[in-house]
Amino acid sequence: EVEFVIATNPGQPHKPLAKIASGGELSRVSLAIQVVAAGHSKIPTLVFDEVDVGIGGSTADIVGLLLKQLGDRGQVISVTHQPQVAAHAHHHYRASKVIEGNSAESLMVALDRQQRVDELARMLGGAQVTDQTLSHASELLSLASN
């Protein structure tokens, strides 16, 4: 039996992960373990569902970079609402739901570069996409591609 203990903030004592971690923290600890383990094992596909919940900015950028590094070794499928994470993806799909009457259909659409810029701008700016959000999205994608 193994019990992980962590301190989620500086100056706090280590406590059992299962008792103190939020869903987002559990996801990020899982990501950290996968990054370390990836150098020693070959897992063909990893799936992360909102591993970036509760973070933003530079932390989201780091999570995106780590997912990209994992994707260099195998397939990574990640659901995200963070443009900083999505910008690092090798491939970007937009998921949406169409409701007609009493039924719903989920759609997945592969995005080309311009569609990625448009989607990142939507993620950054919401319903009102402006020239400024489009410029920011394009820059975000270019920086993540380097």
What name fits each language-model region?
Residues 49-50:
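Walker B catalytic acidic pair
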Residues 35-39, 57, 69:
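Conserved helix-loop functional segments at active or binding sites
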Residues 3-4, 8-11, 26-46:
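GG-anchored amphipathic helix commonly corresponding to the ABC/SMC/Rad50 NBD signature/C-loop
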Residues 21-22, 26, 119:
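ATP phosphate-binding glycine-rich loop and adjacent ATP-lid/helix-beta elements
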Residues 2, 58-146:
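C-terminal lobe/lid and adjacent interdomain/linker elements of RecA-like ASCE P-loop ATPase modules
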